[in-house]
Amino acid sequence: MNRVVYVQPDFPVDAFAGTATYYARYRVPYPAGLLKDLITRAGLTGAGRLLDLACGPGRVALALASSFQEIWAIDLEPEMIVVGQHEATQRGVHNITWMVGKAEELAAPPASFVLITIGEAFHRLDQQRVAQHTLQWLQPGGCLAILGGYGPWSGTEPWQRLVAAIVRHWTSHHAAHGAVAAQPQPGSGPDHNERVLRATGFVEVASYPFVVPHDWTIDTLIGNLYSTSFCSKRVLGDNAAAFEAELKAALLAHDPSGTYSEQMRFGYTIGRKPS
């Protein structure tokens, strides 16, 4: 059945408060092969304008900065924008306009972007509204790309199941604030995203997976978890130290090497505005 069930987001406005520095440092970058593939499929030439919706600290905007004359990057969390601006300055990137606000409420002129990206955020947005807006904002032949990746708690390695169980325990029973559930969620994933794009009027809709090897340490795992809305230091509150201690002890008991390997799954769904 191909009926589209649009997500009506219920994430708190401050769901990512306090996560921006962890996000910039500990989220694994999108694979170079994925970005190169996106550039090729979108037909980017180094000209035109990119819009990065729900941009976080600018992981997509910064990675694609050299492929555009101008970039708009918008996120609801002010700390994300501050960290993104700092990262841009450190990298010598000066073609990004940073904005604080909701993707759903952005006022953008029609037919003004050659590519619009949404990285690991489409499940948190009003999908029907955002998809319709992006179709209006794109130039004819321009593309919308929804990028995503799976966190270290979502894989099938034994150590990942261990991490998931500990995270679930602490965020279900000990959280200082209401924890936001981890993916997968209704209204997320490539198949769903494809249905949304087709229903909106995009053509040439397809999804492309990328798998890359990655080695975690205990510190980078904890930093990555602190970059999430459901296991941030703010969510854990005074229990953060106890959470860290239990996670470290469990991982070292499982594998005392302190290195934990996985095949990380990334991907993107792309659709083109009819010419």
Task: Annotate each language-model stretch with its function.
Residues R49-L51, P57-E105:
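Class I SAM-dependent methyltransferase SAM/SAH-binding core
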Residues L115-I118, Q127:
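A short beta-strand submotif of the Rossmann-like class I SAM-dependent methyltransferase core
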Residues L106-L115:
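A short acidic, Gly/Pro-enriched loop at the edge of an enzyme's catalytic core
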Residues L125-T134:
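A short, conserved alpha-helix within the catalytic core of class I
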Residues N2-T45:
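Conserved class I S-adenosyl-L-methionine
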Residues L135-V212:
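Conserved catalytic/acceptor-binding region of the Class I
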